[in-house]
């Protein structure tokens, strides 16, 4: 089953990610970017999301939201709540979203959601400086 991805969030979150995703992975007609701007209502966002779902009838849908518990998340959950072919995730980083874009038609939407959450956890790190006297083997890379 084909999977479409809806990226949504506050302000220009979604369209900002669109710029990065298209730079790194190219354009993809199965990705939708829905911003919730200051004068938008939850009902307006719900209508946009519902239109994407209707346009892609028969496809699985993964909603990627900026913040757990925010309006885009709540609206996504409301739409996905009664469907076995829709999932909602929140707080994923660009690396995990890119992984999801490349995996989306190879695994189920549930596996995709789980994979993206795991990837975000695994790739969120804090850089630690290396002792200046430590010799680093250039063959090891960064």
Task: Indicate residue ranges for each PLM-predicted region.
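N-terminal loops that bind phosphate or other acidic moieties
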Residues: 2-64, 68-142
């Amino acid at each position: 089953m084909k999977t479409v991805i809806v990226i949504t969030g506050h302000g220009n979150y979604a369209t900002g990610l669109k710029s990065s995703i298209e730079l790194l992975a190219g354009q993809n007609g199965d990705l939708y970017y829905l911003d919730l701007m200051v004068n938008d209502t939850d009902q307006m966002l719900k209508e946009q999301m519902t239109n994407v779902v209707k346009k892609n009838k028969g496809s699985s849908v993964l909603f990627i939201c900026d913040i757990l518990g925010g309006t885009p998340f709540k609206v996504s959950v409301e739409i996905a709540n009664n469907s076995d072919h829709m999932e909602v995730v929140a707080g994923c980083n660009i690396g995990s979203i890119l992984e999801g874009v490349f995996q989306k038609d190879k695994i189920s939407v549930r596996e995709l959601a789980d994979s993206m959450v795991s990837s975000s956890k695994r790739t969120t790190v804090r850089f630690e400086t290396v002792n200046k006297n430590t010799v680093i083997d250039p063959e090891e890379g960064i």
